[in-house]
């Protein structure tokens, strides 16, 4: 049996019980206490651009329809019929004004309102037997959008999304706000790996240390302008709000010179200068750092890199990828990976950038193959009895007395928010695991049961207890998510 208190205490001092990367009890706790109340990325507005467009996304075992209703509002609806629980939408994406349950034919508008109930009067006695008026598919308890990125939380009392993101918004803008019209996404590609979901999130958050070993061959074949993987140590790791990542150190030059070095054409540079704040521009132009990989707690990551795309050419071209580490079990993860690009970029640029993404971080990408080999091995090894005796050292960057090996950069040295250091460390991985431990330490309040189609007062009377809320009632559904009466 897992001693959860001991696990949490060890993680809080930077020592990592190896078995947390393949432990069924830990995973059950994660499902309840972490994924049951965190903000989780599910889609981007560009995936549902028109009224009626939808995609279906999963949060662990829960399926949600992310739709744009007829008024243009984004909805996140639990994909479960109010009658007998059948999924009302079985396609991954499409366009529909209504969703019809294939079991008994109940139908719902794309804003969630029930509009069709066969034999309502004959079978239920009309409204007296089943109150159809005002009933909706269950909306996600909390929904928030930032730069077109759609997040949901299963916690109705979740803090506002932008408060949760905090200063990490500063860095998210580099990936998602390169022009006034934002980005568009292609994908997602999906694949499964026999690895624990936390490993990928940690790797993208701040592990520059693995690059010279794991990815040496990719760098030394000449895919990048930087001739040696060891150059990663000249970049920084930063942590801000609930996310963190890494940067590359760029050669000397002006803002424009440095953005051209990364491969951005002048018209895109012009749009960046219009959209990014002076502080964001200074990180690149004055300080000489460009964002690379990053992770937002708990399971969302970003990648920004600039390989050579065309054979025989010295020119590089940047790509951006967004991905989600979707847990399947304690030892399996579904990776969802999107290609992201400035909506206003030329079609030629989009095509070459997509090629760069597939080459490096698509399902068959060179970096992906290197990384997955490590992650699968770690997960397998963590399952054994010997792993339960081992506390892995996650304290890189700290002396034994807790003092920093390298102090954070000052405001004169670095223009961005958060805590930023040059060189190898595990500060960011610790920050992720500290938040992980904090969630696992705090119990989740049980959610109220929802009664479908009957008066809450009557439900309480029948049950002989307090009245329970009904689906669509103000007690359980945020006002912003409630549908109008049919």
Residue spans of the language-model regions?
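Short Pro/Gly-enriched beta-strand edge/turn motifs at strand-loop
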Residues: 37-49, 122-127, 295-308
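Non-catalytic accessory segments flanking enzyme active sites
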Residues: 9, 16, 20-60, 64
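Rieske [2Fe-2S] iron-sulfur-binding domain
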Residues: 47-170, 482-485
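N-terminal flexible segment immediately upstream of the FAD-binding catalytic core
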Residues: 1-12
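C-terminal catalytic domain of Rieske-type non-heme iron oxygenases
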Residues: 67, 73, 141-486
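Generic structural signal for secondary-structure transition and capping sites
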Residues: 35-39, 86, 209
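Short linear motifs in intrinsically disordered
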Residues: 43-50, 131-133, 363, 377-380
